[in-house]
UniProtKB/Swiss-Prot annotation:
The lineage of its organism: Bacteria, Pseudomonadati, Pseudomonadota, Alphaproteobacteria, Hyphomicrobiales. The keyword Phosphoprotein applies. GO terms for cellular component: cytosol. Binds 1 Mg(2+) ion per subunit. It comes from Afipia carboxidovorans (strain ATCC 49405 / DSM 1227 / KCTC 32145 / OM5). One of its GO terms (biological process) is UDP-N-acetylglucosamine biosynthetic process. This is Phosphoglucosamine mutase. Keywords: Isomerase, Magnesium, Metal-binding, Phosphoprotein. The modification Phosphoserine is found at residue 101. Belongs to the phosphohexose mutase family. One of its GO terms (molecular function) is phosphomannomutase activity. The active site is at 101 (phosphoserine intermediate). Mg(2+) binds at residues 101, 242, 244, 246.
Amino acid sequence: MARKYFGTDGIRGRANGVITPELALKVGQAAGLVFQRGEYRHRVVIGKDTRLSGYMIETAMVAGFTSVGMDVLLLGPIPTPAVAMLTKSMRADLGVMISASHNPFADNGIKLFGPSGYKLSDEVELQIEELMDENIDRRLAQSTQLGRARRIDGVHDRYIEFAKRTLPRELSLEGLRVVVDCANGAAYKVVPEALWELGADVIAIGAEPDGMNINKECGSTSPDALAHKVREMRADIGIALDGDADRVLMIDERGHLIDGDQLLAVIAQSWKEDGRLAKPGIVTTVMSNLGLERFLAGEGLSMVRTPVGDRYVLEQMMAQGYNLGGEPSGHIIMSDFTTTGDGFVAALQVLAVVQKLGRPVSEVCHRFEPLPQILKNVRYRSGKPLENPKVQSTIADAEKKLNGCGRLLVRSSGTEPVIRVMGEGDDRDRVEEAVDMIVAALSIGVAA
């Protein structure tokens, strides 16, 4: 069954366009009913990033949850992985993160976590959607059974201690100068504080949110500012988080980008040497570079690919028994520690390797030579451009052009109206020609 509201990562769209107070109210009521358990008072934790619209959506969701008898614990601005962790730690029935992750400030979204801290399955999301479209007046709580809402103090300290416990107790970051870009988002308080507690010399940028500057020319979607700051401050490493801190990219001391594939290579090789891999391999998506696959094969490690989306990576990790997976965009999942992507915890694992080896980050974190990879986006307003016969014919012609010396991936984004066209192969010019053929056909189809 096609889903009406939920995409690959919750519900997401323009605030007061797609994500309205009415929608948030319905999500709160429907999810509250789905996650009621027995007769005791049910609890939901709600976190958010720093978007201006977060206040509006949070208030509407509180109304929805309390109207069906659920108590609400408000966490305030806090990373998405912290919400997942606290949902489980605080024995809540449900967790909510109000965020549009790496999207511009005008967008917002709603992510839901079950009592174990994992994102909801497609089946549960469909149950919630069905209730959202039903008249549930008769299922609202009686006046004496309405829920209560209150703000919870100390949640930042809980997450900081959780993150620090993922490192060996004796490990210190003393001697490391770290620039961290918090994207003016949910991590602006907790991550600089945690790095300082671990002994690092911390320089924070993107840590002055005003409700409208989240992800604006900063964070993991715009790492140039971080690269400049790392060089300016002669830092050892830079950490770039996104708006809700569930993904991370890094910068070496020379100002060069370290993407999610390279981070996975660093962690996988280190964990293999330490005997910490549950199975000899990792899980990635179809977007991961073939260079990573070749590197892992040289280490005797396999690489399982999934569709794009950290939820699909996690599903395969759980199904096949892997404890490390991720995406080139910087979603890194380490199931020994977390139930979802955690940008900061992933960064800590890399910092631990850097400290252990005592070598420059540029030597530690570039483990393989990536194959040339071209990624272009085509935005559309409506319809299904990929079903256009001319587009399909052009994709087939582009694949013939590569002649088995590379690969093409053309897909619709699950979070915004964009077609992503990715090409990869040993011959960059041939790959770019193939990608441009498809982009041109899509652009004509969109205009038509």
